[in-house]
Every structure is written in C-alpha cells, then in structure tokens.
C-alpha cells in the first residue's frame, strides 16, 4: 500500500481494538494487501508495546506475556472505511450507463428508447421492482405509453445522479410521471416498507420535543404568536409528515435533532420552521411531494401556513360531506368514514398549479373545530400503503370504504398501470385484457368514483349519452373518439371537473363490458351494445358478392381466390414437374395437390409464363421425392404447345387439342361454362340450378357442364351426385328413391372406377362426353345393383350427346379398334347378397344394353387377348394403393381442371 495510513489505537480494558482509517482528504480507492496487513500488524504490536510502557525487551519476553500478546492480536479487529464509497459507486453506475455496459432493460416511449440497469430501476422504484420481478426476462422492454421521452430521460438522470434540472413548464408533467412510476425521492412510496413506522415514530418524537422546547424561539420570531400557534405548527408538522418525500422527511428529522443537540438555538429553529412551512406550501400547491427551496420565514408566513392547513382541513371535510350526501349516506357516517382519508387532489400537466379555493370563509373556526391528530394520520397511512392511481379521487375512496374494498388487496394483487395513461384509455386496455382482474378492479373504482363525483353536478342528458354511445362503441369501430381531452381545460380544477363531466357518459360506456361491475343490467347502454354487437356478428357472416360477376362467396378469402382466378389478367404459371400451365397461382396449387400427391411442393420453384418446360429439372425434383423418371421420358410425355403444329405433336396432340377446343352444348366457350358452374364456393349455384330466373339454355348448359364434372372430378357427396344426375335427365330433384350413402355396397369400388375414368380418359381414346356418359351409366348401374329400377329409361330422356351407341358409331377408335366399353362396378358377394342375384345384369356394353356375367367374362377375355397394357403411373409403386390416388403421367400432362388448368 503506497499511500500513508493513519492508525488510531484505542485500547479497551480487556482487549485493544485498533481502528484504521484513511486520512481526512478523500482518496479515490483503498486496497489492503496481505503484505500491508502484515506490516500493519507488526507496527501495531510495536505501538501497543510502547503505549503500555512495557520495559521488557522484545528479544526476551516471558512465555506467559508472549502468549497473552498473541491472544490479544487474535482478538483485535480492524475497521476499514472507504469515505467516498457512495460517490464512487454512484459514479460507477453513471459510467456504466454512459458506456451502455451491462445494461439489461430498455424503456421505450414516444419513438425513443433508453437503456438502463434493472438493479438501479428496482432500487429507485417499487413499481419497476415489481414489474421486473413479475417478468424475469433477460432483457425486457418496458413500453410506457403516453409518456414523454423528456420526462423519462430526466427520471433516469435523477435515478442515476440523484438530482436533475427541470424547467418550470415541464415540472408538472415530470412530477406526475414520477408519481405514477413511484420514483423514490419524487413520490411518497415509503408507506409499504418496514422503516416507515420507525420514521413516523422519529418524526412524532422530534415534533413533541420541538413543542416543549421551542416556546422562546417562537416568541422571538413573533410576539403575536402564542402557545396555540405553537401547537398548531406542531400539529401541522405531524399532518404533513406523511406527505413529505424521503429527502424532505430526513431533512426535517435532521434539523430537529440538530436543534435539540445545539441548545435549541434560534437559527436552527428558524430552519426547522422553514422546512415545515415550505413543505406545507408544497403539499398545498402541488399534488406531489418534491424537494423545493424553502422561502424565507417571517411571522406572516408562519401564520399563513397555519391558516392554509386549517382551510385545507375544512375543504376536505366539506367535500367529503357533500359527496356522502349525494351518494345517499348520512353526513355523520361520511365524516366517520373519511376522517382518516386524506384528500387526493390531482392536476393535469400544466404550466402552473392552480390555487385551492377555500369554501369556508372563516378558516379560524374550521381550524379550531377540525384537527388531525397523530392517531388519525397513522390510520390513514396504514390504509394507503400504495400510492393512488391516476384518477383516484375522494369519491372513489368513499366508494371503496362503503363497498368494503380493501386497499391491502390492491397492494397484494395489483397489476401495474401504464404510466401516464388516461383512465378511459386504460378502460379499453382493460377490456382487451379482461383476464387481469385487478386492473379491472382498479378501473371499476376509478370509473364509479367519477360517476359518484359527477352525481352532485348537472345531470347528463340521456339523448346526449345515447349520441355519444353511438360513437364510442369500441367493439365495432376502429377509430374511436378521443377522450383524453384536448388540453383546453389544463391547469385548473374547474377544467378537470368540466372534462370529467363531459367524459362521464363515455366513462359509463365502459362499465358494461366489465364483468361484475354492476349487480344487473345498467340500462344505460346494454340494449344498444347488444344490438350493435349482433349486427356486427351478422355482418361478419354475410356472403360477399363479387363486384365483377355478382357471384356470392362465403368469405373474403374465397372471394379473393375467385377474383384472382376469374377476373385477373395473368400470363399463367407452368408446373415444374409435368409442364401443365395453370392460369393462376391458386389453380397451380390445386393442380399440384391433386396431380402430384405425395410430393412436397412447398420448395418447388414457381415458373411464370412464358417459361419452357425443363425435363432435366423435373427429373431431379422427382428424384428428390423418390420418383425416378428419366428426362427423356418426361420430354416424350410432355404435352404439345397447342394446336399450331409444334414439335412433339402426334396422337397426343390431337387429344390435347380436342380437349382445349371442347365446347358445351350451347356453343359457348369453355371459360363461360367454368365461370357459371365450376366454383364450389359460389353460393348462387343453387339459385341458378333450381331458381325461376334462369333461361332454359342456361339451365341446360349448367346441367351438361355439371355432368362433365363426372369426367374430371370425383364428387364425394353422393346425394349431390344423384341430384345432379336427376337434373341432367330432366327428372325432379326428389327421385323417390333412397339415395346411396357412403357405406353402400361397392361404393369404394365405384369411386375408384370413377377416378380411373377421370385420370385415364384420353389414354383409353375417349372424349370427355364419353367419359361423362360412362360415369353416369356406372352410377345408374350401382343404383340398379342396390335394387332401384332406373335401368329402363324412357326413350329420348337421355340427351343425345350422352348416348353411348351414337358415341361409339361416331368414334371409330372407340367403336371398332378399341375394346368394348365395359363398366363393371364389381361388388363382393357378401356385400350384395341381399340385393344381387347371380343372373342380374350389372354392366353396360358399348351398345348401351345391360350385360350378364357371361358376356362380361367374354369381354374381359377379349380385352386380355388384345393385349391392352395397364397405364404406367410413373411412381415406381411408391404411391399406388387401393384408392388409386395418383394418376399416370399422361393424365398429368393432359389434365384440365375446373379452375383453369390447361396445356400449351
């Protein structure tokens, strides 16, 4: 240790206690090493020997004396004191904040953010301490709404430095924010801590000493002040002790002790009375306790302080009595309930605090008749362990007392209100987070307190309330009228009263949404809110019409899909796996999910048109999915690019061109048929099908296009399928037979067969009309197998384009070169034992008549003899199954779905 250290030796009777202190000049740091401690011990031993005046030589000490000396060394303690410890620690925290080292919390407000340390915020504010303990995050972000960034910056400077300079205009806002955030030194937050009782006891003890010993000093201050004035000053000192900030309280305590220790000189008594009068003025002119420069004390100022305290007492008593009378309770009960409750006056942020009006013209009588003793003040402090919320007013305290709401419960289960937020804004946030029961409890107290306070004033107009409620409904409007006030009433108590009076109907609107607030329906806004909510629910489920074509859709999502598919000019998108072109992104997704099941398409690239089909890329993507197809095979299977005679045409080109040029019976283009019937989300389909407004040609076109859906889409709803079949055949909707359900005999086999027709139409040389007719006859065969007599149809009932005999005669590939069309809804004998006989016809030949089992077996042998090869699904049996979910590559190439997929 390089610095000189002064050793002060103080020996007691039993053992010497050495106190080692640094010299009076403040040093930056003190470090004690092992060598320095040993040197100090040796010096101490020599100093101790010299101090005791021992004449023994250190070289030859007696054994007994040496032993006792060692015991004394073991019993000695060293007091190492760092004089500038507090300043060094505080400067270290300031340096850490300036360098942003080890910061672990962020305060965000007004588009700015400030970093700080949790330990500093927790030490300076019980609010932040509870908040950070309740949210144990590594680096939380605290969002302070409706708080100015200048106030937060000044508060952080105050917490790290202990002082801050604030302009006079910003002082009310700054003090209000400090009060809401419970910053120590700027707000009275000591009520809930253990040392508050000791502090109150010390203040009462010092004040009693001042009462007994300050008569001469008070006489020197003013000859007009008698013993009653001294007692009044002592009483005022007790009254304002609970309103003083920690700095003021400690200052008053220190001044009182100094006056007692220095023979109660007049100068110290002046400073003590100075503090009392300054604190009293501070408590009268501002709702917050803040350190202020005390004004010079004169006899008139002391008398004015006593008169002001008396007038404040009278004002509180009169206001409490008036509020109790308006609430329906007796004045005596109100006085007993509010005697221990101090008035809490709140001012909005303004440039200057307004003076308190004195309703009592004779303050001396009020002073003599209304005194706050120490017991009442102690009871008041016990009942207010936490600082009041933003808009907690005297009538809210009365409501709490009348309804038995305990403040201790608020302390234990308190939720943290957002700093600087208006109570009606907190009303909305409380409705949004209705699970926070204590926030709702605090909100109920605040709103009902405002209602009780405004009940003595002018009665609101019910029509005016209803008009404001129409614009205040927060459940149905995103742009709500602001009820924070426009600043026109800032700075005066009259302005606050007017603002609360105007916002009273709006405040009551929020009471309806809080559960448990009122015992029954309030009647103010319940009918309107329920009716408005019902209307909103109806509107939320209303169908949405298309602005282009007038079709009605169930949701906004289906309407957007329809607009993109039908009414948006898009070049189209090409399937990267098979080259099929879809006219919209939704159609491409539909094609992927139907034609490439089992292959994850979320990572596949989207190729907008014009984009060429890349077989190599498709082969690599299929290989990743476990499907091995060579690029050459994919190139050979790729569909031609339309009917312009491009390369890769051939027989496949003819079928593709036939599909693209397919038109309906009415001669309209294919897109018209798609627009009229292919949208499953269109709610106007039923009206168009069975309504009275459609023409016969439109109805016929709808029936025919619906029948064509049998050829390229499997209908899972069997009742809808039979109804569509009956409509196509001109029969009534109710066929008079029992519709087959999904558990009918052979239903799964029939579904598989219909899907096979769908996916292999062009591979078998069939047109779309032929596939639709085959699907229709298969459905009729299933009905016949179930015992329904639908096999004998009247002549001319079936449309000509669906007559299989005419179709076979007009298509040589279908009639002669190809095998006979046999539709066999094969069923297990155990399933159809009750409805099927061995000789019952089950199938249709190409001529349209029913075939027996012998003919079916013969045709089956003919098909085998002609060597009809099965379709290659191209998936290496990875996805084959009983339901044949995946089609072959030819069907993928030439797939045309109802949502606009086509080939180029």
Curated annotation (Swiss-Prot):
Q: Which residue intervals are annotated with compositional bias (Basic and acidic residues) in the record?
A: 429-438, 481-500, 851-868
Acidic residues bias located where? 671-682
- Residues of the region (Disordered) are 1-30, 53-72, 204-287, 349-390, 411-438, 451-501, 633-696, 832-904
- CC terms in the record's Gene Ontology section: nucleus
Bias category Polar residues: which stretches? Answer: 1-15, 239-253, 452-461, 876-886
Query: One GO BP annotation here?
Result: negative regulation of transcription by RNA polymerase II
Report any Pfam family annotated for this entry: BTB
Q: Which superkingdom does the taxonomy of this entry point to?
A: Eukaryota
User: Which CDD domains does this entry report, sorted A to Z?
Assistant: BTB_POZ_BAB-like
Q: Which residues form the BTB domain?
A: 103-168
Which keywords describe this protein according to UniProt?
Answer: Developmental protein, DNA-binding, Metal-binding, Nucleus, Phosphoprotein, Repeat, Transcription, Transcription regulation, Zinc, Zinc-finger
Biological role stated in the UniProt entry: Expression is vital for development; may be involved in transcriptional regulation. In embryos, muscle specific expression is required for segmental nerve b (SNb) motoneuron target recognition within ventral longitudinal muscles. Has a role in establishing and maintaining embryonic muscle attachments, adult sensory cell formation (macrochaetae) and morphogenesis of adult appendages (legs, antenna aristae and male external genitalia).
Specify the protein name. Answer: Protein abrupt
